[in-house]
Amino acid sequence: MSLIIKSILNADAEARYFRPGELAQIKGFNASAASRLRLVQALTENRERIVKQSANQLFQKRPDIVSPGGNAYGQDMTATCLRDMDYYLRLITYSIVAGDSTPIQEIGVIGVREMYRSLGTPIEAVAESIRAMKYVATSMMSVEDRAEVDTYFDYLIGAMQ
């Protein structure tokens, strides 16, 4: 849940106006909006590169995934793997915009481990694909930008384990 929504809900639950500290937090959140949107734009514009390079890293590290019997064996299954990676990158962009991990949690994580287990997909391979995307994505960023983006990649990786 974004800082703004949390502040509204907290104030409303107590039937009060915003406190000065809450207003200062909202001001800071709004001041960082341009930076967050710039990061999301960069990730969005480079999504194909991020996903393809990350998939190549994953498949080199885990050749069992693309070998006969692997979950990404064959053109259709590889495309499904790339689609899932793109989906998780998109969730990360939602969270960056929100300034909060709630979109990852509410849209993408609930029940995902069980789903992958039921499909016979090794969840550690999914986590590894997200680690690879983190590496590729952050290699294109400044140290300051990495700190912002790392938070969401790390949250998603942790949720997959």
UniProtKB/Swiss-Prot annotation:
Keywords: Antenna complex, Bile pigment, Chromophore, Electron transport, Membrane, Methylation, Photosynthesis, Phycobilisome, Thylakoid, Transport. (2R,3E)-phycocyanobilin binds at residue 81. It is found in: Cellular thylakoid membrane. It comes from the Bacteria. It is a peripheral membrane protein. The modification N4-methylasparagine is found at residue 71. Contains one covalently linked phycocyanobilin chromophore. The chromophore is added by phycocyanobilin lyase CpcS 1. Its main location: membrane. One of its GO terms (cellular component) is plasma membrane-derived thylakoid membrane. Pfam families: Phycobilisome. InterPro entries: Globin-like_sf (IPR009050), Phycobilisome_asu/bsu (IPR012128), Phycobilisome_asu/bsu_sf (IPR038719). One of its GO terms (biological process) is photosynthesis. Light-harvesting photosynthetic bile pigment-protein from the phycobiliprotein complex. Allophycocyanin has a maximum absorption at approximately 650 to 653 nanometers. Belongs to the phycobiliprotein family. Heterohexamer of two alpha chains, one alpha-B chain and three beta chains. PANTHER family: ALLOPHYCOCYANIN ALPHA CHAIN, PHYCOBILISOME 32.1 KDA LINKER POLYPEPTIDE, PHYCOCYANIN-ASSOCIATED, ROD 2-RELATED. This is Putative allophycocyanin subunit alpha 2. It comes from Nostoc sp. (strain PCC 7120 / SAG 25.82 / UTEX 2576). The gene is apcA2.
